[in-house]
């Protein structure tokens, strides 16, 4: 079973352009998601203690996929952004929670993945920051 860590605290540093999501849960190795726009890409750094995964998906693709997400009962993630080797699997829950699974695939024998959950308030901040326009709006 997957263990999703909630990211319910967010900080937008307008000086550096860094958007940070973290957990309010007091734990020694709290997960953290840092994002920064870099031209046509978004640099993501996902860390959990000393382990970090860095991805650079195209911002237009991320914006488009987030705008088309709908909750599908029984499925955790329904879309992916990136390539077959490095991607973010995304899923929207019926309560507005966004599931994110940044993944690095080694080959057919394994992968490294972070299971993150953005609360509805955190998701709203992300959507505004990326510039998401929902298809149903």
Could you describe each region identified by the protein language model?
Residues 1-137:
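Positively charged, low-complexity terminal tracts
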């Amino acid at each position: 079973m997957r263990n999703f860590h909630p990211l319910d605290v967010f900080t937008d540093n307008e000086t550096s352009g860094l958007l940070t999501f973290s957990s309010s849960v007091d734990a020694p190795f709290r997960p953290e998601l840092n994002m920064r726009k870099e031209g046509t890409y978004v640099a993501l750094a996902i860390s959990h203690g000393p382990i970090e995964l860095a991805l650079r998906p195209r911002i237009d693709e991320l914006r488009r996929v987030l705008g088309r997400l709908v909750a599908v009962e029984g499925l955790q993630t329904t879309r992916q952004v990136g390539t077959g080797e490095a991607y973010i699997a995304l899923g929207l829950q019926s309560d507005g929670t966004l599931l994110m699974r940044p993944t690095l695939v080694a080959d057919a024998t394994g992968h490294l993945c972070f299971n993150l959950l953005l609360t509805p308030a955190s998701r709203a901040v992300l959507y505004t920051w990326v510039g998401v326009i929902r298809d149903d709006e």
